[in-house]
Amino acid sequence: IPEFKEKRIKNMLLITSGFAEIGAEGRRLEEALVQAARDADILILGPNTMGICNPHDTLFCCGSNVRPKPGTTTIVSQSGNLGVQLLDFAEHEGIGIRAFGGSGNEAMITIEDYMEAFEVDDLTQTVVLYLESVKNGRRFFQSAKRVGKKKPVIMLKGGRTQAGNRAAASHTGALASNIRIFEAAARQAGIIVVAQPMDLL
């Protein structure tokens, strides 16, 4: 990371896993990573992410060969595998994609940051979310309410079973909230809540 600072690099996409999602040792490593990035004035997307894509700019930095056409639907997924499945479905069905982000562990850039970006992005006309947890519930729901007044926000919440909760923790390094409470709050914020992945698109 200090070498990146010398090259004046401001952003880093970190696909690598082995950080907060694996436990205490990984959390310490992630905290050290974040501190090094802050010292170098660098923003990290990830770690433990499948990457990003922006078909409008032919930017495909993700662990998949899918190439959906440009469009107006933006996808952010805390599960990289599900995110890639959604991209594959979009490509197969001819659904245009504005952008995709696999948010990973959200060590620096969080789902709340994404939501605030969607609010001012005119190319995004529909927001699709797969969430396992949020770090700042108040900020998330406030931004979702603002975005929802301008464009639909569609969400699938992971962790519907005990096994799902464990899987969510392994993906994001955070515990999933009680799903009924979370979904009720989401509906109050104007989010369209669905129960199956393919209902997102």
What are these regions (language model features)?
Residues 1-201:
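Catalytic-core regions of core metabolic enzymes
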